[in-house]
């Protein structure tokens, strides 16, 4: 596999941003009651998977998927907190810490 370079990292970062956008739009669509927001959410998911498919051309699939999912979860938690006033329980915080530690271990491996 090629080296973890800026080009493929850019696609991975784009995939993360699009995934977060999709999650936010899905929440705002109110279960597709606001159809246009729901459709934008689906478009963002399609974009996220397209970007991820480009990222894995230069990043091992296991690493790319773990980082994509991990950063997506962490940032979606932050977005939920900031935009929708959602809070994590202490168990949720423990899970987030474990997730971040796992991502760090994968990145350093």
Swiss-Prot record:
Membrane topology summary: Multi-pass membrane protein
Pfam families named among the record's database cross-references: Multi_Drug_Res (PF00893)
Biological processes, Gene Ontology terms: glycine betaine transport
Localization in the cell: Cell inner membrane
Membrane spanning residue stretches: 6-26, 36-56, 64-84, 88-108
Keywords: Cell inner membrane, Cell membrane, Membrane, Transmembrane, Transmembrane helix, Transport
Lineage top rank: taxon: Bacteria
GO cellular component, one term: plasma membrane
SS bond list: none
Membrane recorded as keyword: yes
GO molecular function (one): spermidine transmembrane transporter activity
Subunit description: Forms a complex with MdtJ.
PANTHER family recorded: SMR FAMILY PROTON-DEPENDENT DRUG EFFLUX TRANSPORTER SUGE (PTHR30561), SPERMIDINE EXPORT PROTEIN MDTI (PTHR30561:SF6)
HAMAP family on file: MdtI
Similarity-based family: Belongs to the drug/metabolite transporter (DMT) superfamily. Small multidrug resistance (SMR) (TC 2.A.7.1) family. MdtI subfamily.
Role this protein plays: Catalyzes the excretion of spermidine.
Protein name: Spermidine export protein MdtI
Source species: Sodalis glossinidius (strain morsitans)
Taxonomic path: Bacteria, Pseudomonadati, Pseudomonadota, Gammaproteobacteria, Enterobacterales
């Amino acid at each position: 596999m090629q080296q973890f370079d800026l080009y493929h990292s850019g696609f991975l970062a784009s995939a993360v941003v699009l995934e977060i956008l999709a999650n936010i739009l899905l929440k705002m669509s109110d279960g597709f009651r606001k159809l246009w927001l729901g459709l934008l959410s689906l478009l963002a998911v399609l974009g996220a998977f397209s970007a991820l498919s480009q990222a894995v051309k230069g990043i091992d699939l296991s690493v790319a998927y773990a980082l994509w999912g991990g950063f997506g979860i962490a940032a979606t938690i932050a977005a939920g907190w900031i935009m929708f006033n959602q809070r994590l329980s202490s168990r949720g915080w423990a899970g987030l810490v474990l997730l971040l530690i796992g991502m760090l271990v994968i990145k350093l491996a």
